[in-house]
Amino acid sequence: MKTILYSLLAAMMMIGCDNSVATKGFDSVDATRFAEVIENEQVLIIDTRTPAEFNEGHIPGAVNIDIDGEEFAAKVAELDKSRPVAVYCRGGRRSKEAAEHMVSCGLEVTELAEGILSWKGEVEK
């Protein structure tokens, strides 16, 4: 059953994204550089953790798009491709996966390499 669910999730992540287009990748940065990136008001900050993790504390201004949620791919496909995205999770694994998907969808992405665990700035609850 889990295999089927993971297969469906993988298929859904491909919807709306053109994987045949060469992408430039994404920047994986430390907390200091990430703080500089998100100072730009045009940057959309995305927290890829679960809603429960998000509610425990998140970077101010972040929106929650759970990478393990059913609607992750659909929500990413709806994002404004003209806005740069800054993405993070708890420790870096989920945000790297999300960043790869977002880049395949045509988004410009900066990823917080070691997640919110490395964040020294303000956290909002």
What are the roles of these predicted feature ranges?
Residues 45-47:
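Structural scaffold elements adjacent to functional motifs in cytosolic proteins
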Residues 2-6, 15-37, 43, 52-84, ...:
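Rhodanese-like catalytic fold shared by cysteine-dependent sulfurtransferases
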